[in-house]
Regions:
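Carbohydrate-interacting regions of secretory-pathway proteins
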Residues: 16-231
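Sec-dependent N-terminal signal peptides
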Residues: 3-13
Length: 231
């Protein structure tokens, strides 16, 4: 009975297209600036110091696909490198290479930080900026200027302060991103942070997955248990 159950489970996982994006040991399958990215304590780790600051936003990029419709789950943890406690990062998805030699990408970003303002929002790196604040359901409409779309708030996904209160500092949190058609949803620790439908011609349909190291004060950000399930 056990072999049959195991085979059935493997078949269901194969059908769902579940892929572990990180082997827990090294940077196989990923590309980024080795000055900042490594594996520490079984996690993908981006680290900057006062002596070695990040000059511009740089990214660790998954090399093995540009998924369209998917669910991505992972755990992340942040540690400020000084008493300023400024630590900002994000998960890029449906993104594109902007400056490959500098490991710079642009596109949708599931934002998070050590502070209380930006975790859970939808930001578009190298693009249209903040597209949805935490706790909002938004429809993005075409504007006269493609870089300045009309953001129509159509509802709430929850209370922003309550969502923030459930995010742990100096510990692991779980992020989930669900992208299907022109709709994207983001969750932190099981709470829906944004629900966005992008009706513009600029809406990305597919693209790379990447993790951000933000320019600025010293910081450390870590990622593990990274699972991509494609439709």
């Amino acid at each position: 009975m056990k072999p049959i159950l195991t085979l059935a489970l493997l078949a269901s996982l194969a059908t769902a297209g579940e892929t572990q994006l990180f082997n827990g040991k090294d940077l196989t399958g990923w590309q980024g600036d080795p000055k900042f990215w490594s594996v520490q304590d079984g996690a993908l780790t981006g680290k900057s110091t006062a002596e070695s600051p990040v000059p511009h936003n740089t990214f660790l990029i998954w090399k093995d696909g540009e998924p369209s419709d998917f669910t991505l789950t992972l755990k992340y943890k942040m540690t400020p490198g000084d008493d300023k406690k400024f630590t900002n990062s994000g998960i890029q998805y449906r993104s594109k290479f902007m400056e490959p030699a500098k490991f710079i990408v642009g596109g949708y970003q599931a934002d998070f930080e050590y502070g209380d303002s930006y975790s859970g929002i939808l930001y578009e790196e190298k693009g249209r900026g903040i597209l949805a604040q935490r706790g909002k359901q938004v429809v993005i409409k075409q504007g006269d200027d493609p870089s300045r779309p009309k953001l129509e708030v159509t509802g709430e996904t929850g209370d922003s302060a309550e969502i923030q209160a459930g995010i742990k500092k100096d510990d692991w949190n779980e992020y989930k991103i669900v992208a299907e058609g022109n709709n994207v949803k983001q969750y932190i620790n099981g709470k829906l942070t944004i629900d966005v439908t992008d009706e513009t011609t600029e809406a990305p349909k597919s693209g790379v997955i990447a993790f951000q190291m933000h320019a600025g004060p010293p910081m450390k950000v870590q990622f593990k248990d990274i699972v991509l399930t494609t439709k």
